[in-house]
């Protein structure tokens, strides 16, 4: 049976809040700025913990790779929270296009959304290989440049943090430095 999933349309850029899983907190928080600059209303999810990690097992096969399970768990927990208008919420997930199962996360997520009672939630794909041709999420050259700059800057902040953290005199000073650096983007 084929499921006709809801599409993320260009018009939804103005009306929908896009939820993004927290895969690399420093880089993704910076990426959030790039997406907002381009007109997208988005939010990086901060929900985590063992309760969140167990949620996806209700809707995803337990043989699914653990990172996929965690990402789907984050989305379902956020949708269950009551914090979002479910008729004006969309999800954004990356697709690698490689041999890893990560290219299938989007299909696992859509299936889990239907099972969890959220068939109306569109899922947009962030990929550079044309895997989802009907997505209204547009990766323009200016957005791609900003996104790459955010990822590189986030990588540098993380590398700097990892180098100075063992030598900090005040516990948490390295993390504060990352927050200050992130705030200056």
Language-model features: where?
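An N-terminal assembly and electron-transfer interface module characteristic of large anaerobic redox
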Residues: 1-184
């Amino acid at each position: 049976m084929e499921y006709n999933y809801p599409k993320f349309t260009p018009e939804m850029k103005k009306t929908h809040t896009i939820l993004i899983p927290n895969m690399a907190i420093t880089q993704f928080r910076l990426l959030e700025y790039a997406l907002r600059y381009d007109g997208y209303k988005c939010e990086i999810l901060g929900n985590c913990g063992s309760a969140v990690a167990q949620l996806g097992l209700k809707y995803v096969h337990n043989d699914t790779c653990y990172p996929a399970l965690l990402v789907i768990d984050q989305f379902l927990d956020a949708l269950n929270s009551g914090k979002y208008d479910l008729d004006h919420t969309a999800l954004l997930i990356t697709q690698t296009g490689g041999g890893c199962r990560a290219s299938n996360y989007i299909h696992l997520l859509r299936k889990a959304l239907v099972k969890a009672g959220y068939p109306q939630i569109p899922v947009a794909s962030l990929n550079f290989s044309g895997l989802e041709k009907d997505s209204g999420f547009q990766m323009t050259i200016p957005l791609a440049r900003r996104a790459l700059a955010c990822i590189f800057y986030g990588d540098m902040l993380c590398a700097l943090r990892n180098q100075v953290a063992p030598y900090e005199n005040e516990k948490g000073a390295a993390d504060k430095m990352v927050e200050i650096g992130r705030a200056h983007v």
